[in-house]
Regions:
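RNA pseudouridine synthases
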Residues: 2-318
Length: 318
């Protein structure tokens, strides 16, 4: 006799294949085969992998399909091991510690995504990070607890290459803090906007600068975008950020960086290229600056969302 799953409000709106992938302990090819052979049905009707499931839909599955809720140990979010900044029925926002990856990968034994799967094992929809922070970056991480909120948050965290000119007229929606080598006060005062075109060096396995055009104000930044555009050139992509010096102490500076684009290692590369690498950054800082006692610090400290139906507030900070 076939089993069935009921689509909850949290899980509605996603594709059938994604719903089954999140609900069952099964390989992708198994799920596709069950759908293709009619062993999976939506409200007693044959379905396709990319059909959208809705709240209260009944999804028939084979009797031998292992339900994730039955095969994983049940835990509650009360045991969640990270500081919670904000939470409601749609969204969970945590303070991610340094040293843990957001997603699994080579050599990543522990990551946020797998921890969410474990702690929400009984849920019909497993919450997931809406964006990524590097393993060594700490701070605000947005997590969608429903399919709809996850999709909304993911879209919010994307940079819109077509509207960068409008974006730089306002504060960036993602703000970071970092300690850098050197006294950056004068540089930050004269160059509050950093504009680099970055590319990935396969041989060195790091991001490098194709060329630089810094700006003294928002109008100059808009002019740079208008002149050079946002489309990749020679495989290099635009990386745009604002810069402010908060404190200078013992030959190091605490800075605030607002990013308008989301390039890999963007903050680390832009500051290193400007002559002020992050303290303890073994990948981009010159070895002559590095000291054993230096501790890497890069923190996502503020995120601004547009008005929405999923959160009661729009600005989140630590």
């Amino acid at each position: 006799m076939a089993n069935s799953l009921l689509v909850t409000a949290q899980a509605g709106g996603q594709k059938l294949f994604n719903f089954l992938k999140r609900s069952l302990h099964a390989e992708n090819n198994e799920i596709h085969r069950w759908i293709r052979t009619g062993q999976v049905r939506i409200n007693k009707k044959r379905a396709k992998a990319f059909d959208i499931v809705h709240e209260n839909d009944e999804i028939r599955i084979p009797p031998f399909a292992p339900n994730r809720a039955d095969t994983l140990p049940k835990k509650t979010v009360k045991e969640f091991p990270f500081p919670v900044i904000y939470e409601n029925e749609h969204v969970l926002i945590i303070d991610k510690p340094r040293g843990i990856a957001c997603q699994g990968g080579t050599g990543q034994k522990e990551n946020i995504a797998d921890i969410l799967k474990e702690y929400y094992s009984a849920a019909n929809f497993v919450p997931a990070p809406a964006h990524r922070l590097d393993k060594e970056t700490q701070g605000i991480l947005l997590i969608g607890k429903t399919y709809q909120s996850l999709r909304f948050l993911t879209e919010c965290m994307k940079s819109d290459e077509n509207s960068l000119r409008q974006a730089v007229r306002h504060e960036a929606k993602k703000i970071y803090r970092a300690w850098v080598y050197g006294d950056i006060a004068d540089f930050a005062r004269n160059t509050p906007f950093l504009c680099h075109y970055l590319y990935h060096n396969e041989e060195k396995q790091k991001e490098e600068v194709f060329f630089v055009r810094h700006a003294a104000n928002r109008k100059e930044t808009e002019d740079i975008i208008s002149k050079y555009g946002t489309k990749p050139m020679q495989k290099a992509q635009i990386a745009l950020a604002s810069l402010k010096c908060l404190e200078v102490k013992n030959g190091k500076s605490l800075v605030e960086i607002g990013i308008y684009t989301g390039r890999k290692h963007q903050i680390r590369v832009q500051l290193a290229s400007s002559g002020f690498p992050l303290v303890g950054d073994t990948k981009y800082a010159p070895k002559t600056l590095l000291r054993k006692k230096d501790e890497f610090f890069l923190q996502a400290c503020k995120i601004t969302l547009p008005p929405n139906d999923f959160t009661e507030q729009c600005v989140f900070g630590i």
